[in-house]
From Swiss-Prot:
Record-stated family: Belongs to the bacterial ribosomal protein bL20 family.
Pfam families (alphabetical): Ribosomal_L20
GO cellular component term of the entry, any: ribonucleoprotein complex
Domain of life: Bacteria
The name this protein goes by in its record: Large ribosomal subunit protein bL20
Functional description taken from the UniProt entry: Binds directly to 23S ribosomal RNA and is necessary for the in vitro assembly process of the 50S ribosomal subunit. It is not involved in the protein synthesizing functions of that subunit.
Molecular function GO labels: rRNA binding; structural constituent of ribosome
HAMAP family in the cross-refs: Ribosomal_bL20 (MF_00382)
PROSITE patterns in the record: RIBOSOMAL_L20
PANTHER family assigned: 39S RIBOSOMAL PROTEIN L20 (PTHR10986)
Gene name of the record: rplT
Length: 117
């Protein structure tokens, strides 16, 4: 059986990792070992970040809705319950956007929620 050397495979793998590490600080973008560690860590961070983004945006939307409803003397939980009883099926993303961009329509929703409590 012929001897197989890994020169081309290693070069290809190293180039792939170093390409991913482009723009990293110091030796992390030039030395393979440190670049490989940095790339692995960054991939782990990006995976976690994609999960966290969903939580963070939901928290942001709730905070915005809460702030807007409290200006109309209503808490977030009572507002959401009032909307549910009224049969309004708008998600938090849309409600937060309305609270920021369209205050008059949001005020109507708050009144609707108050009337259905």
């Amino acid at each position: 059986m012929a001897r197989i050397k890994r020169g081309t495979n290693n070069r290809k793998r190293h180039k792939k990792v170093l390409k991913q590490a482009k723009g990293y600080y110091g030796s992390k973008h030039t030395l393979f070992k440190t670049a490989n560690q940095a790339v692995m860590k960054s991939l782990a961070y990006s995976y976690v970040g994609r999960k966290r983004r969903k939580r963070d945006f939901r928290k942001l939307w709730i905070a915005r809705i809460n702030a807007a409803t409290r200006m109309h003397d209503l808490s977030y939980s009572k507002f959401m319950h009032g909307l549910k009883v009224a049969g309004v099926d708008l998600n938090r993303k849309v409600l937060a956007d309305m609270a920021v961009r369209d205050e008059k329509e949001f005020a109507k929703l708050v009144e609707l929620a108050k009337n259905n409590l």
